[in-house]
Amino acid sequence: MGSLSIWHWLIVLAVVLVLFVGGGKISTLMGDVARGVKSFKKNMADDETMEGSTGSGGHIAPPGPAAGTVQRDASFSGTGRPSGSSTP
């Protein structure tokens, strides 16, 4: 009980910021953040409408194998021998 928790320190820090920085600057900062979020949402909506108007129909071709990859045979067991062979 003798020490203060993190919540106590955060409240003290908020009070000190309001006293020294002033409430007007904080409200201006919050307004700037709100305008930034609105701008971000608007641009995301514009991007979605641009993608819809490209005429591709929303279909994306499945990717092919990457360059340098090796296709394995389904009967390969990983031991160096085909899975159907028996060892003498």
Swiss-Prot record:
Organism of this sequence: Gluconacetobacter diazotrophicus (strain ATCC 49037 / DSM 5601 / CCUG 37298 / CIP 103539 / LMG 7603 / PAl5)
Region span, Disordered: 45-88
Residue ranges crossing the lipid bilayer per the database entry: 4-24
Keywords noted in UniProt: Cell inner membrane, Cell membrane, Membrane, Protein transport, Translocation, Transmembrane, Transmembrane helix, Transport
Keyword Transmembrane helix: yes
Primary location recorded for the protein, binned into one broad class: membrane
UniProt entry tagged with the keyword Membrane: yes
Topology with respect to the bilayer: Single-pass membrane protein
Subcellular location: Cell inner membrane
GO cellular component: TAT protein transport complex
Protein name stated in the entry: Sec-independent protein translocase protein TatA
Pfam families: TatA_B_E (PF02416)
InterPro entries hit by this protein: TatA/B/E, TatA/E
One MF term in the entry's GO annotations: protein transmembrane transporter activity
Function according to Swiss-Prot or TrEMBL: Part of the twin-arginine translocation (Tat) system that transports large folded proteins containing a characteristic twin-arginine motif in their signal peptide across membranes. TatA could form the protein-conducting channel of the Tat system.
Organism superkingdom: Bacteria
A GO biological-process term: protein transport by the Tat complex
Assembly and oligomerization: The Tat system comprises two distinct complexes: a TatABC complex, containing multiple copies of TatA, TatB and TatC subunits, and a separate TatA complex, containing only TatA subunits. Substrates initially bind to the TatABC complex, which probably triggers association of the separate TatA complex to form the active translocon.
